[in-house]
């Protein structure tokens, strides 16, 4: 069985784990930069190694019988270029969002990316939007294959929309600017008087936690608003199941940072929760407006408020959205199908079928 070195930022229970450890027909080494990035002990095993402890890439590759390198961010692809040069192994690089922008990047990042495009064999952006971005930067189109992040459909079974009387709006994501939580809170404030029983729950932690709490006070959202900033990933399906509407108000951050396609959108669609999201980055690749959800302009409080009001008043449409959304996820975002596609890309690169 061919073995792949996967370099990731850290070891934690993200959506990257299946793309590292569950690719059919391929064994793995889970490489992180150094032990301090080993943050989730249950995921620690004998296949977790540290880049800082590899002094001779050639000896390491020969000892471990490695066939392929896979960096799970462009920045990590740059880190693996010297490794690739010494070992002559093919290099695959995933492109996930910020790495296809100049947001908070070091001086010379674009020059580094052009070198990566020249020397790397294969690039796997997580959506067509990012594929287009890196092509504009100079990545040859024949080196690009879109690989969507998949959803474990067993973990997120279809339940259908909640058609009872509750009006719970839920948003899940790190508390960073590009998630657009502040826009959602302002939109929710605009409709609150018309829907006194409606609630808004934001689930996630991050650098803007203090700002989000302050904004909730400023908007006088009171008990209609909850921020759950310390939630284990294992509890997310249960909390998502309490939603009547899932909202992903993503936007382009002031520093240029963008999304790919938020995994939480895929998870909500899989379970049959009506989804309201912005026309941002790769999101239109999973949601067709008025078919399997609703799309609004990004960073537009009034448009989002109108859409929230429409959704809350249109429960008769929810089941249609939910059924279409589940079909979309099953067809294009099933984790098992995407892992098979990843294996196919590896096979092609290594000269297989």
For every predicted segment, state its role.
Residues 213-234:
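Nucleotide-activated donor-binding/catalytic signature segment of Leloir-type glycosyltransferases, i.e.
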Residues 104-107, 135, 141, 151-166:
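Acidic anion/phosphate-binding donor-loop and adjacent secondary structure
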Residues 289-290, 294-301, 310-316:
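Conserved acidic donor-binding segment of nucleotide-sugar-dependent glycosyltransferases
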Residues 14-18, 167, 171-193, 207-213, ...:
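A conserved mid-protein helix/loop that constitutes part of the nucleotide-sugar donor-binding site
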Residues 265, 270, 274-277, 287:
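Short hydrophobic beta-strand element within catalytic cores of glycosyltransferases
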Residues 71-76, 95:
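Short His-centered aromatic/hydrophobic patch
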Residues 129, 150:
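Carbohydrate-associated surface elements
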Residues 241-256, 273:
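Acidic donor-binding loop of glycosyltransferase active sites
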